Amino acid sequence: GTDMENIQGELEKVFCYALERDTITKEDIDAVCVTQITNHIFEMVDAVAAGNQQKALDLYYELLALKEPPMRILFLLVRQYRILFHVKALANQGYGRKEIASKAGLHPFVAGKNMEQAKRFKMGQLRRVMEEGAQLEQDVKTGLLTDNLAVELFIVKQSER
């Protein structure tokens, strides 16, 4: 739906949740409103890059609580690393934020955030992470791993570096 429809839906949920009370708290909103999944994914990659395994796992469990399928989370995580790989490759070629945004199909602000995040990784690391993500996806499809375990393994392994 549209943003206004989403806002209206979220407001309705908050009103129903706090029905018996006169005031709505931030905790009420946090308890019922859908958080932006892409923000969680970006924060997870940040936590992984910083070696903060617990924070990355906490964010993953929050996404699961929001009924986000594990395979979608894995796809989005690998996609974020792919974006970082592309952004870092362009930056290494001497391109600036605006050119990177244009070439990578990103908003300039988003390109800037990705450029900062990409600095925390080496090109080889990013390539390896993408390959490992693809392998885990294959392991789930062939029944070697459950989807949930695959994502947990991905987060744990990447945050140990």
Located regions from the model:
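Conserved beta/loop motifs at nucleotide-recognition and modification sites
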Residues: 1-161
